[in-house]
Amino acid sequence: FFAALFTGGFFIFATYHWWLAAIISGLIAIGVMLTWVWTGTAEIPEKETKDVGLGLSLPLYISGPNAVGWWAMFITMTADITAFVSLVFGYFFYWTIHEEFPPQPLQGPGVFWPGMVLLLIAYGLTLLSRYWNRSGQVSAFYLSLTLAAVVSLAGACALLSGPWLTGLDPTTHVYPAIVWVLTGWTVLHVILGVIMQLYCLARRAAGKMTIQWDADIVNVSLYWHFLALTVVMTVGVIAGFPSVS
């Protein structure tokens, strides 16, 4: 209830440009969500299976494609990337209705490729951390996932630097506006990905995630599959299309 309440508050306050209230509401929503998932999800069971009658035993903990949590992440991100594709469609829609798109002389969009490279490295490190965890290489897990979080933040900053350093003003033309929307969407998802990475580090340190009980890092890796696709599409459209057109 509180997660929904404060998440709704974030969007409502932002609609009216009440930025401080929106930020506070968003932070509270994130805190409530983290508390909920920390205390109520992926709990390590006392035993691996439970007898349900008629000689049938069912596992009490599952990770991967057979788990409800994995499918919840998959369905959520499928809907999420559908919304993202609609934004990409908006970019090309504006191209079809403007004689000159992007406008000339072109201001921006800046250099986006370093950000994409950094975020793909972070993606690889996240997948590697899942492997290290399952292999029992605890130190390697901590190192790879910590580096993934750091590189992710660097990649997000690199993406933002493109339109920021070239002075793209979203109020002057639809082109800089859609560039900022696509960039902001991607960076917001990177920030969520970093929160997930840090969450997995905390779960492993607290003993709530182990070699066998690894639903957290498995689900986060799935999220990063979709995020990597989002990054490639964003950079391909923003940085690649102007040069092609």
Where are the language model's segments positioned?
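...captures the hydrophobic TM-helix bundle architecture rather than a specific catalytic motif
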Residues: 1-245
